[in-house]
């Protein structure tokens, strides 16, 4: 039986991991064992944070809408409920954009919400 030498394959695998760890600090970017652990952990962080990003942005949009609605003496929850009653279906991302960049349109949305709530 022929002897199997895996030097080329191992070297390629090590190179791949070191390439993925480029930019990491110290041994994490140079030593295969440490770099491999760092790459695995970074993959776990990436997976987790791709999910958290959705939550974080939704939180941000809600905070922005709440801050904008406070100027019109209305709470976020009442504003959203009023929009639902007046059957205006705009998602929170777009509402926050309108609140920042188009104050006049946002004021109209607040008025619709207040009318639906009869405030």
UniProtKB/Swiss-Prot annotation:
GO terms for cellular component: ribonucleoprotein complex; ribosome. GO terms for molecular function: rRNA binding; structural constituent of ribosome. One of its GO terms (biological process) is ribosomal large subunit assembly. Keywords: Ribonucleoprotein, Ribosomal protein, RNA-binding, rRNA-binding. Gene3D superfamilies: 6.10.160.10, Ribosomal protein L20. Pfam families: Ribosomal_L20. CDD domains: Ribosomal_L20. Binds directly to 23S ribosomal RNA and is necessary for the in vitro assembly process of the 50S ribosomal subunit. It is not involved in the protein synthesizing functions of that subunit. Belongs to the bacterial ribosomal protein bL20 family. This is Large ribosomal subunit protein bL20. The lineage of its organism: Bacteria, Pseudomonadati, Pseudomonadota, Gammaproteobacteria, Enterobacterales.
């Amino acid at each position: 039986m022929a002897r199997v030498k895996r030097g080329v394959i191992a070297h390629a695998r090590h190179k791949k991991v070191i390439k993925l760890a480029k930019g990491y600090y110290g041994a994490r970017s140079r030593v295969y064992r440490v770099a491999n652990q760092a790459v695995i952990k970074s993959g776990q962080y990436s997976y987790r944070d791709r999910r958290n990003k959705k939550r974080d942005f939704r939180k941000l949009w809600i905070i922005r809408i709440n801050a904008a609605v406070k100027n019109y003496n209305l709470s976020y929850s009442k504003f959203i409920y009023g929009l639902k009653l007046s059957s205006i279906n705009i998602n929170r991302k777009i509402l926050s954009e309108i609140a920042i960049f188009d104050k006049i349109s946002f004021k109209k949305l607040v008025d619709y919400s207040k009318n639906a709530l009869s405030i």
